[in-house]
């Protein structure tokens, strides 16, 4: 694979729990001159703090088989507090401790990641039937300000993005929950950079074997056979590649091998 000057890395909540190892890897890559945009997850931590604050987390299943968080206003407050506060600070501290200059952002900063709030969403109800419900405070990303992100990357080693975008309600700008894989895919497409979706499994596994390569045209078919969670990663990787990223890799560390397209499941145009 060709060498790129910028890469986008998504670290899920399970990987973030092994933060020291991840921070070590990111530090090595940054010292080698690679500029990194890192998107973090942390849904389990959000769930933990939601329950502490008396807000029971709610998840919904979509007809596509994708499972997502349902974000009420109360849940949004906890989500932003944990993602953009507690977790972002913890990850930034680890990276800064390794001598890296880190800029921690959400999509509201610089109005850099814009999403459209979903007024209605279709879910699968308890009877297994499609049902439309209010969309809550969840968004679908529609725009990334690549010039802003690119200019910030010239000044730091790592940009750390929490999966929070901004939306508009009349004259008001509001925070919206966006899926971390979606945010990473949108950033990599806008920056035309490789995407590494780092997980705790070696790649997309079907029939007991890691799938080496998925073409964009095959993504929906293969996602339908993958488990909940992995199906979203496949779809978001395909979205990134179809919209500008040269390729995306799904798998476990080392992160550099994923960025180079040397391991995991590679998602490509053809």
From Swiss-Prot:
Q: Keyword Hydrolase on this protein?
A: no
A Pfam family annotated for this chain is AA_kinase
Q: PANTHER family given for it?
A: N-ACETYLGLUTAMATE SYNTHASE (PTHR23342), N-ACETYLGLUTAMATE SYNTHASE, MITOCHONDRIAL (PTHR23342:SF0)
The record's comment on protein family reads: Belongs to the acetylglutamate kinase family. LysZ subfamily.
Q: One Gene Ontology cellular component annotation? A: cytoplasm
Q: What is its EC number?
A: 2.7.2.17, 2.7.2.19
> This chain belongs to which protein, by name?
Putative [LysW]-aminoadipate/[LysW]-glutamate kinase
Task: Please list the GO biological process terms of this entry.
Answer: arginine biosynthetic process via ornithine; L-arginine biosynthetic process; lysine biosynthetic process via aminoadipic acid
Task of the protein: Involved in both the arginine and lysine biosynthetic pathways. Phosphorylates the LysW-bound precursors glutamate (for arginine biosynthesis), respectively alpha-aminoadipate (for lysine biosynthesis).
Q: Which positions bind substrate? A: 42-43, 69, 177
Which keywords does UniProt give here? Amino-acid biosynthesis, Arginine biosynthesis, ATP-binding, Cytoplasm, Kinase, Lysine biosynthesis, Nucleotide-binding, Transferase
**Swiss-Prot/TrEMBL catalytic activity:** [amino-group carrier protein]-C-terminal-N-(1,4-dicarboxybutan-1-yl)-L-glutamine + ATP = [amino-group carrier protein]-C-terminal-N-(1-carboxy-5-phosphooxy-5-oxopentan-1-yl)-L-glutamine + ADP; [amino-group carrier protein]-C-terminal-gamma-(L-glutamyl)-L-glutamate + ATP = [amino-group carrier protein]-C-terminal-gamma-(5-phospho-L-glutamyl)-L-glutamate + ADP
Species of provenance: Aeropyrum pernix (strain ATCC 700893 / DSM 11879 / JCM 9820 / NBRC 100138 / K1)
Which pathway is this protein engaged in?
Amino-acid biosynthesis; L-lysine biosynthesis via AAA pathway; L-lysine from L-alpha-aminoadipate (Thermus route): step 2/5; Amino-acid biosynthesis; L-arginine biosynthesis
Q: Which GO terms describe its molecular function?
A: acetylglutamate kinase activity; ATP binding; N2-acetyl-L-aminoadipate kinase activity
Subcellular location(s): the record lists:
Cytoplasm
State the NCBIfam families in the record: argB (TIGR00761), PRK14058.1-4 (NF010662)
**UniProt keyword annotation of Amino-acid biosynthesis present:** yes
Say where the protein is mainly found. cytoplasm
Annotated site, Transition state stabilizer, chain positions: 10, 233
